Structures are given as C-alpha cells and as structure tokens.
From Swiss-Prot:
HAMAP family: Ribosomal_uL16. Part of the 50S ribosomal subunit. The gene is rpl16. It holds the Pfam family Ribosomal_L16. PANTHER family: 50S/60S RIBOSOMAL PROTEIN L16, LARGE RIBOSOMAL SUBUNIT PROTEIN UL16M. This is Large ribosomal subunit protein uL16c. It is found in: Plastid, Chloroplast. PROSITE patterns: RIBOSOMAL_L16_1, RIBOSOMAL_L16_2.
C-alpha cells in the first residue's frame, strides 16, 4: 500500500475539490493512459488494486506508471463515540483527484491489450474514467 514515509502533520483538513486538474493531466511517460472524469478521493487500496489488475493483465510485456500518490490522511472516529473530544485518529491515505488527472500510464503493449488492462483497472476506481492514447 502506498503512503508517505514521513509527513509534517498527522491530521489534515478535508478541503474541497473545486475545478479541474491543471497538473498531471497530460501523458508524460507511456503511450496509453487512464484519465479521471470526476473529482474524488482515491484510497491507497484502490490505487494498488488497479495497479495489480493492470500488471496481471499485461504480464511481462508492458511498463506501468502510477501517476497519483496518496498523501492525504483520512481520520475516522471509533464507532459509538459521542461527539466532541477531538478529531479521530488517521486510518488510511487518499489521493485527491480532480477531473482531467492521469491515474495510470502504460506502454510496451498492443492497443487492444492496453485497453483491456486499463478497463479492468478503471472498474476498480470509484469514479468515471476514460482511456486515452498519446499523440
């Protein structure tokens, strides 16, 4: 599972996901990519599940790049706890994804294989996505 090695603060505000992604919205490394069409928090487990699905599908042929990293801690309060008495403890990490962001990139395989692998990874994501080709 992906998570930061060290971070300055244990807890973070939730924040807002306004607008579109101006960074990380172009294909940089591979030939094929999966692009987000909706804003969402994507957990480190979902990122890992998508990566595994793609890796299993392309086997040895292709190379895969994960373009998002979960750097936001999400806190959860224990169940049946009364209101107040501070913020909960950090449970898991999420990547804040805005529309237009590239999630995964791939190269070194045929288009039909890449399309199949990326569609399987897309089914693991909690948002609408699209398959794009560079060039």
């Amino acid at each position: 599972m992906l998570s930061p090695k060290r971070n300055r603060f244990r807890k973070q505000h939730r924040g807002r996901m306004k607008g579109i992604s101006y960074r990380g919205n172009r294909i940089c490394f591979g030939r094929y990519a999966l692009q987000a069409l909706e804003p969402a928090w994507i957990t480190s487990r979902q990122i890992e599940a998508g990566r595994r699905a793609m890796t299993r599908n392309v086997r040895r042929g292709g190379k895969i790049w994960v373009r998002i990293f979960p750097d936001k801690p999400v806190t959860v309060r224990p169940t049946e706890t009364r209101m107040g008495s501070g913020k909960g403890s950090p449970e898991y990490w999420v990547a804040v994804v805005k529309p237009g962001r590239i999630l995964y990139e791939m190269s070194g395989v045929a288009e039909n294989i890449a399309r199949k692998a990326i569609s399987i990874a897309a089914s693991k994501m909690p948002i609408k996505t699209q398959f794009i080709i560079s060039g």
